[in-house]
From Swiss-Prot:
Family: Belongs to the FAM216 family.
Positions with biased composition (Basic and acidic residues): 36-49
The organism of origin for this protein: Rattus norvegicus (Rat)
Domain of life: Eukaryota
Pfam families the record matches: FAM216B
Protein name according to UniProt: Protein FAM216A
Disordered: annotated span: 1-52
Organism classification: Eukaryota, Metazoa, Chordata, Craniata, Vertebrata
Gene name of the record: Fam216a
């Protein structure tokens, strides 16, 4: 009798375990089915969104973009703009070429470039003047003259390094656009180029002397004369057509001897 009890009690326990496993499997199947349907719905929505986005892009691509092109009045009757197959970019390119070939625009560009170079040359930092004032302030208690200060300072034993660096500072401080045939030679500078110093170079020494206001007065006169000469050259510039395919630029400027006494 005791041996039959476990056998009788055994099948209901197995049935309960099988029932629990079946319910768990059914719930898992339902959950996986629900998540699969959600993913499918999300994919469908995203597909609709992408299709609508591509449709908008295609519509924008097909529609022509209207752009405003400003064409000068002197070029409206030009034959190269009346071609029916020209696009807006090609018309703009042709107008830019015609604008460059215009004499007034070319004159403006030349004057702007010249004035830019001229002002850039005047705004170069004066390294030598600053260096000189710094050294003279250090030795002002012993010597009163800046010239003697430079002489005594350069004649010292450690003057070789400063003498080697001085020509570079002179070039930076006195750099200007070339006006005439005279230029900065190695170790020398013309009187009209130097506003505040006279430079005398010897084989082993470098001397700097102050200059009066009369020496740099011709420099200002040269600047005004050059600007007047540039304006005369700009006014006499013209474009002459040679044939039907190309044009040449003719500039008639006065000689320097007649413009500058």
């Amino acid at each position: 009798m005791p041996s039959r009890c476990p056998g009788v009690a055994g099948p209901p326990a197995l049935a309960r375990t099988e029932g629990s496993e079946g319910s768990a499997g059914q719930s898992y199947h339902q959950n996986s089915k629900g998540t699969g349907e959600q993913h499918k719905a999300e994919r469908i929505k995203e597909g609709h969104r992408m299709s609508s986005h591509t449709a908008k892009l295609q519509e924008l691509w097909r529609t022509t973009q209207i752009q405003t092109i400003h064409i000068p009045k002197s070029m409206t009757d030009a034959s190269f703009l009346k071609h029916p197959e020209l696009t807006s970019g090609q018309k703009r390119y042709l107008c830019s070429i015609a604008k460059i070939c215009n004499s007034s625009y070319l004159r403006t560009l030349m004057k702007r470039q010249y004035m830019h170079l001229f002002h850039h040359g005047l705004q170069k930092p004066g390294v030598l003047t600053h260096h000189r004032s710094h050294i003279s302030s250090r030795y002002s208690q012993k010597q009163h003259s800046p010239c003697t200060t430079w002489r005594h300072h350069l004649e010292r034993e450690d003057s070789l390094g400063i003498a080697a660096e001085a020509p570079e500072m002179i070039i930076h401080a006195l750099w200007r656009p070339l006006r005439h045939k005279e230029g900065l030679k190695i170790g020398y500078a013309s009187k009209t180029r130097c506003k505040s110093l006279k430079i005398f170079r010897r084989p082993g020494r470098l001397f700097l002397l102050p200059v009066s206001s009369k020496d740099y007065q011709p420099c200002m006169n040269d600047e005004t004369k050059e600007e007047d000469l540039l304006n005369e050259c700009m006014q006499s510039m013209s474009i002459q057509e040679q044939g039907s395919s190309h044009a040449s630029l003719t500039v008639s400027c006065p000689t320097p001897s007649s413009a500058i006494p």
